[in-house]
Amino acid sequence: NFEEDPRVLLRTRLENSAGEMASDNLALNDVVLHKWLTARMIEFELWINGRFVESQRSDGIIISTPTGSTAYALSGGGPLVYPDLDAILLGPICPHALSNRPIMVSGSSTIELRLCGRTTANDVRVTCDGQTTLEMAADSRLLISKAEHPARLLHPAGHDHFKVLRNKLDWGGRRQ
């Protein structure tokens, strides 16, 4: 016997300056905008639901699903999020300002990233689940939102998410 476990997928669209779709990808864990072939920070604007949030100088940003909260996002200082929560996590990678902290937004949100400042296309890459790498032109936009359909995982009957966390994160067992 198996139990179905629907999980949020992220849809990542890269649009060029004319608004045409240059790339369309899915990610189960995370989408990462990160520096590439440079030792200096990158600079980008973060928009959520069409509203400007901030310009950030950092080594990048991790946009994660609740499933991905136990992966790269956790290593970057993000929270563990229960997998059936309808949320998207945003975690800066080595931000220049100590005020840049991880945040969590509604799963219905649309995240938009735009390069700014001296950051050029040669300075950054976008990686989806550590597998697909995209080049981002300086005048393009990266749009990240929840995919229309979830991933459907199957677990053996009686699956216990917290048991998985105890094993994966080496949490102590229950004291008798």
What kind of region is each of these model predictions?
Residues N25-L28, I93-H96, D123-T127:
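Short Pro/Gly-enriched beta-strand edge/turn motifs at strand-loop
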Residues L14, K35-L37, T65-S69, C94, ...:
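Glycine-rich beta-alpha junction loops
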Residues P6-V8, A27, R40-I42, R57-D59, ...:
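A generic structural signal for well-ordered coil/turn residues at beta-strand boundaries
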Residues S55-D59, I63-S99:
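Gly/Ser/Thr-rich active-site loops/lids in small-molecule metabolic enzymes
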Residues N1-D59:
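Catalytic core of DAGKc-family lipid kinases
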Residues L33, N49-F52, R101-Q176:
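ATP/nucleoside-binding phosphotransfer catalytic cores, i.e., glycine-rich phosphate-binding loops
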Residues L26-L28, I62-T65, A71-A73, L89-L90, ...:
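Short hydrophobic-aromatic micro-motifs
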Residues L46, G68, V126:
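Short aromatic-centered micro-motifs
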